C-alpha cells in the first residue's frame, strides 16, 4: 500500500546572526510533528533551510569585512551544528544561495513576467531595514515605526517589479473564508480584514537598492525580492535536486 505523503516545513530562517531559542522552538515543534506522522506511516518530507539574501545580510557582511556568501556560510554552519546536536530529523535543508534554487527562482520570475503577472513600476513607502519590509502609513505602529519590530522606518522610493496580487483578491478571500486552508480561523479573518477588504495591493517582488540577491535575468539592475526568492524555497518545487 502506497504511503500517504505529509509535508511540513519550519520557517526559512534568516541568517543575519546565529540561531536563538525562537529558532529552536519552531524547529522542535516541526520535528515532533514529523516524527509523529512517520510513526503513523506517512511518507514525511520535513524541510528546513535559510533565506540568505537581502540588504541586512549585505550590511552585516560589510561590517565583518567578508563577502555576503562567506558570511552566510559561517552562520549556516552554526544552524546545522545546532540541528545536529538537537537530533532534528529534517529531510532537506535548502539554502537560497544553492545553485538549483537560484535557477528555479529565475525561471519562476521569468514565467510570471511572460504571462503578464509581473510588471515594472515604482514603489513608494516606509521601509524597515531590519525586517526588509515596506509598510504603508496606515500599517505603522502608534509611534510611526515598523509594526513588526517597532524600529524606525525610512522613506523609500525605487523602481521595482510588482506581482499582480490584486488580481487574485477574490480567489484568496474565498480560500480564507470558505475553507480550512489557514488555521486557526482567527488568522484567516485577520488577513481578510487587514489586507483584502481595504483593497489588496500588488506585491513588490524586486529590489534595486542592494546587490546581494538573485539577479532578474532580463533586467540585471534588479534582484529578486524575498516573496519569490524565499517562498519558492518553501514550495519544494526543485524537489528532484539533492541537498
Regions found by a protein language model. Give the residues of each.
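Structured secondary-structure scaffolds
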Residues: 1-48, 95, 100-104, 155-240
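Short, charge-patterned binding micro-sites
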Residues: 50-56
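Short low-complexity, flexible loop/linker segments enriched in glycine and/or proline
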Residues: 59-63, 107-110, 134-138
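A charged helix-plus-loop insertion that forms the helical arch/lid used to bind
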Residues: 60-73
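A broadly conserved sequence feature marking short terminus-proximal activation segments
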Residues: 71-127
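Cys/His-rich short segments
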Residues: 117-169
